[in-house]
From Swiss-Prot:
GO terms for molecular function: DNA-binding transcription factor activity; sequence-specific DNA binding. Probable transcriptional activator. The gene is ramA. It comes from Enterobacter cloacae. Gene3D superfamilies: Homeodomain-like (1.10.10.60). This is Transcriptional activator RamA.
Amino acid sequence: MTISAQVIDTIVEWIDDNLHQPLRIEDIARHAGYSKWHLQRLFLQYKGESLGRYIRERKLLLAARDLRESDERVYEICLRYGFESQQTFTRIFTRTFHQPPGAYRKENHSRTH
């Protein structure tokens, strides 16, 4: 494994551990010791997707899990994962899961709640 691949694996692990807070590419690059542009190029090269897309998709998967497994309000879930507003969260969630968060919850909510 090359040093660049190791760096990306370390960054992915750090991102996954910090998805509950706002993550800006600039901050991740600073944490990694790379420029924003260089880190984005490396990430795309080794992961086959953009850094921003990776973060957004991971946050959406966690939000979907929370919708299925909790009774928390959609607004609280959207804030937890750093979305700018509930409207933005709903638009991105709907584009990804083909239904708004409320409908997704109704259809997929765990039977234990």
